[in-house]
Curated annotation (Swiss-Prot):
The protein, known as: Adenosylhomocysteinase
UniProt cofactor note: Binds 1 NAD(+) per subunit.
Localization per Swiss-Prot or TrEMBL: Cytoplasm
Further facts: Has antigenic properties. Elicits a specific immune response in systemic candidiasis human patients undergoing malignant hematological disorders.
EC number assigned by the record: 3.13.2.1
Binding positions for NAD(+) per the UniProt entry: 161-163, 195, 224-229, 247, 303-305, 350
Function text: Adenosylhomocysteine is a competitive inhibitor of S-adenosyl-L-methionine-dependent methyl transferase reactions; therefore adenosylhomocysteinase may play a key role in the control of methylations via regulation of the intracellular concentration of adenosylhomocysteine.
Lineage start: Eukaryota, Fungi, Dikarya, Ascomycota, Saccharomycotina
Catalytic activity from the UniProt record: S-adenosyl-L-homocysteine + H2O = L-homocysteine + adenosine
Amino acid sequence: MSSAPATNYKVADISLAAFGRKDIELSENEMPGLMYIRKKYGPSQPLKGARIAGCLHMTIQTAVLIETLVALGAEVTWSSCNIFSTQDHAAAAIAAAGVPVFAWKGETEEEYQWCIEQQLFAFKDGKKLNLILDDGGDLTSLVHEKYPEMLEDCYGLSEETTTGVHHLYKSLRDGKLKVPAINVNDSVTKSKFDNLYGCRESLVDGIKRATDVMIAGKVAIVAGFGDVGKGCAMALHGMGARVIVTEIDPINALQAAVSGYQVAPMDEVASIGQIFVTTTGCRDIITGKHFEQMPEDAIVCNIGHFDIEIDVAWLKANAESVVNIKPQVDRYLMKNGRHVILLADGRLVNLGCATGHSSFVMSCSFSNQVLAQIALFNADNKEFREKFPEFAKTGPFDVGVHLLPKVLDETVARCHLDHLGAKLTTLTETQAEYLGIPEEGPYKADIYRY
């Protein structure tokens, strides 16, 4: 991507841009969905005139997402949605390519808020955003609460995560949501791939890089058995751990039980767990009473979204002392004489202690994000929707929380198959008539659960 460096940015070290560029080029080959979108929609410039404020982990994979948005005509500003998840060479490369980015690994909470606000005022000629691309809801909340005037000409927002989607639905119920929102998280090619298969690989990567501990034979407690929890349980079991699942939902608990996992409350298993992983998106999953029960050098980490799943504040206030072993690895001495090892300060372990999900699975997620941004920006563009019939059902949007249509979900899946050498079977006309579906899809009803 060739353009002048951004004049308004803040990254850790701009000299890392060349390193970041090499990594971006390597990832592009592993992100066929985004490359397909650039090739198919690029000539039409469907995001020309869009001003997208993005708040999402500033990684190499996100750099490919950003450059895809730019290739489609958008002006973009960026911040990270997590204080530890930025890859500094990725941020440098994006700044050097001309995108105002405000992100570095190891931000303070104050710096994190500063970065999000700075991006809002970094568009050319002092213009305001007209689209939001969010991960977790912090940017959405900031604009709604502090800068509501920016929503007057905003086409809408797209949200990446389970946590952020929960906040959107709550905001809608409370009458506080002011623009249309697309729930990217619940696209099948996001939740069933990023959340499950992505976490299945990146959780263990984070734990291993942080601790070098052998997982085989250990008791691992996985809090939550949604898609993220399923992926984590599979990964730990595959490494030889004895996995115990905690759940509030009887359906998820039953799924865990018939998958071969013991299901029990945290209060009952905290004393035997050697590795603890929270995946719920809820607060107070691991609290002081659990820390006090844990065996020596229990490893505690989170792969939900925010750091409130683990009561880190209690741990810091009540531990006798703490020793920083290495970045994002802290060993706390408890008053009972035992130690607890906390990873990534209770934030996302796969991004804080490793590099997050692989490029390929993020291509699935980010393809949905790009399609959502296109859909929002062109919701009233009848000519565009006639030219690209896959967008025929994407608008106009009312204020509310919407899903992308099944045809776009299938498009995302389809454009990743060649990379894996997978070939589809084609329905015959007779078969399609028998099933009552079009030969070219969509193949499943919206209520189908994959």
